[in-house]
């Protein structure tokens, strides 16, 4: 009897597999990280999810969302001081995951504000003229920023940019001419972080403010992706920018690339939130949908697809966790970020497409949200380094040979 009792006791104490957290990510998070995530999840589900269908249908970006996020303290969250939260990189990733679980467009707006506007000002800006002037208002969501690097003729090759900055020593200013395109937030931005080539051939960062003469930001219409975020151009026609608006510690292309790596890190987390939504939706739909007298989920093909989705999401999340811990130890390389940006975006897009298919005809209805995630992820797989560009970054690291151009 004693043996049988011990056997039953041992069996009952055996851990149970939880498909919602297969490798127990929860136990590897700090109490603060869990609290931050759960608080923001509540906001996202209660305040953003009810808006997203109509926002996406009507191609409308709700500017007040940024102010709401500012009140929650999630803008520039890893920055210390200036009204920012100073949280861990993992906490930032968890925020991106919860936001993109609702919509990639919303995450894009937050990501640009935090990683591509606030980060360069914090890392490369002057203390009084730039950091103190802009960061507190950006953190509160009073100001909304954008990041201008991509140009009409130069996407994956920003080093060939045509935007020029001419120095005017007499009045201590620069004159900027050129155009940037596919710029998240630009039509509604108050602050523009723009990269331009100067006469000494150095690429420098400039802070342009809404209302400067010669500066315009027309909206790009007709997008089939990221419809709930504002995307546009930045047109500069003899825009005069004072010297005090030049980022003093930024004088090479490595600087905007460093900013992009910060954003790519957040994207790697974010896309898995979208993928998780698609997995959960496909699972519930195939459990509820009866065909040939049984749930679709009884079909072996369906179960294999769900298993594949769960596997990729789980591996991606734990890789992100490791990358976040390394980031806080200042041990991250650009190649590490490229590996996860490329893998997680590609896998998330595949998962969204599979989920769309599993929902049958209902899969193309925005009421189920999956088609919106699929369309969004098409863009996320492309921006901030395409799937192929990140492959070349990794290929160069593996072989020691760059394959971006035909140069020997």
UniProtKB/Swiss-Prot annotation:
One GO BP annotation of this record: fatty acid beta-oxidation using acyl-CoA dehydrogenase
Keywords carried by this UniProt record: Acetylation, FAD, Flavoprotein, Mitochondrion, Oxidoreductase, Transit peptide
Listed cofactors: FAD
GO cellular component terms, A-Z: mitochondrial matrix
PROSITE patterns, alphabetized: ACYL_COA_DH_2
Binding site for FAD: 147-156, 182-184, 289, 300, 357-361, 386-388, 404
Superkingdom of origin: Eukaryota
Catalytic residues in the record: 384 (proton acceptor)
Catalysis: reaction(s): glutaryl-CoA + oxidized [electron-transfer flavoprotein] + 2 H(+) = (2E)-butenoyl-CoA + reduced [electron-transfer flavoprotein] + CO2
Compartments it resides in: Mitochondrion matrix
GO MF terms, alphabetically ordered: fatty-acyl-CoA binding; flavin adenine dinucleotide binding; glutaryl-CoA dehydrogenase activity
Gene3D superfamilies found in the cross-reference section: Acyl-CoA dehydrogenase/oxidase, N-terminal domain, Butyryl-CoA Dehydrogenase, subunit A, domain 2, Butyryl-CoA Dehydrogenase, subunit A, domain 3
Pathway assigned in UniProt: Amino-acid metabolism; lysine degradation; Amino-acid metabolism; tryptophan metabolism
Modified sites of kind N6-acetyllysine: 210
InterPro entries: Acyl-CoA_DH_CS (IPR006089), Acyl-CoA_Oxase/DH_mid-dom (IPR006091), Acyl-CoA_Oxase/DH_mid-dom_sf (IPR046373), AcylCo_DH-like_C (IPR036250), AcylCo_DH/oxidase_C (IPR009075), AcylCoA_DH/ox_N (IPR013786), AcylCoA_DH/ox_N_sf (IPR037069), AcylCoA_DH/oxidase_NM_dom_sf (IPR009100)
Segment annotated as transit peptide: 1-13
Keyword Flavoprotein recorded: yes
Enzyme nomenclature, EC number: 1.3.8.6
Family of this protein: Belongs to the acyl-CoA dehydrogenase family.
Function: Catalyzes the oxidative decarboxylation of glutaryl-CoA to crotonyl-CoA and CO(2) in the degradative pathway of L-lysine, L-hydroxylysine, and L-tryptophan metabolism. It uses electron transfer flavoprotein as its electron acceptor.
Protein name: Glutaryl-CoA dehydrogenase, mitochondrial
Taxonomic source organism: Sus scrofa
């Amino acid at each position: 009897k004693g043996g049988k009792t011990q056997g039953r006791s041992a069996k009952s104490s055996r851990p149970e597999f939880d498909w919602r957290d297969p490798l127990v990510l929860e136990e590897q998070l700090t109490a603060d990280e869990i609290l931050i995530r759960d608080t923001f999840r509540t906001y996202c589900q209660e305040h953003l999810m009810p808006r997203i269908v109509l926002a996406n249908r009507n191609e409308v970006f709700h500017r007040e969302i940024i102010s709401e996020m500012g009140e929650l303290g999630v803008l520039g969250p890893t920055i210390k001081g200036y009204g920012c939260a100073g949280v861990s990189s993992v906490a930032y990733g968890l925020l991106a995951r919860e936001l993109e679980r609702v919509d990639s467009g919303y995450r894009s707006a937050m990501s640009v504000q935090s990683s591509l506007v606030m980060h360069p000002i914090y890392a490369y800006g002057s203390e009084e003229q730039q950091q103190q002037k802009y960061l507190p208002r950006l953190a509160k969501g009073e100001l909304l920023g954008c990041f201008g690097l991509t140009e009409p003729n130069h996407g994956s090759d920003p080093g060939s940019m045509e935007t020029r900055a001419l120095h005017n020593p007499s009045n201590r200013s620069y004159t900027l001419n050129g155009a940037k395109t596919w710029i998240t937030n630009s039509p509604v931005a108050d602050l523009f972080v723009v990269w331009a080539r100067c006469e000494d051939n150095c690429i420098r960062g400039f802070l342009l403010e809404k209302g400067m003469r010669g500066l315009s930001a027309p909206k790009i219409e007709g997008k089939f992706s990221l419809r709930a975020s504002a995307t546009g151009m930045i047109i500069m026609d003899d825009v005069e920018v004072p010297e005090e608006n030049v980022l003093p510690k930024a004088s090479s292309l490595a600087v905007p690339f460093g900013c992009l790596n910060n954003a790519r890190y957040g994207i790697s987390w974010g896309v898995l939130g979208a993928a998780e939504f698609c997995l959960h939706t496909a699972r519930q739909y195939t459990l509820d949908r009866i065909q040939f007298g049984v749930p679709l989920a009884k079909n072996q093909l369906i179960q294999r697809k769900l298993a594949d989705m769960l596997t990729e999401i789980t591996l991606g999340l734990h890789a992100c966790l490791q990358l976040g811990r390394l980031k806080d130890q200042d041990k991250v390389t650009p190649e590490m970020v490229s590996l996860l940006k490329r893998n997680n975006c590609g896998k998330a897009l595949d998962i969204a497409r599979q989920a769309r298919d599993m929902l049958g005809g209902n899969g193309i209805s925005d009421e189920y949200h999956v088609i919106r995630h699929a369309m969004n992820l098409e863009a996320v797989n492309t921006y901030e380094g395409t799937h192929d560009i990140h492959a070349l970054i990794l290929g160069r690291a593996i072989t020691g040979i760059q394959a971006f151009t035909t140069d020997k």
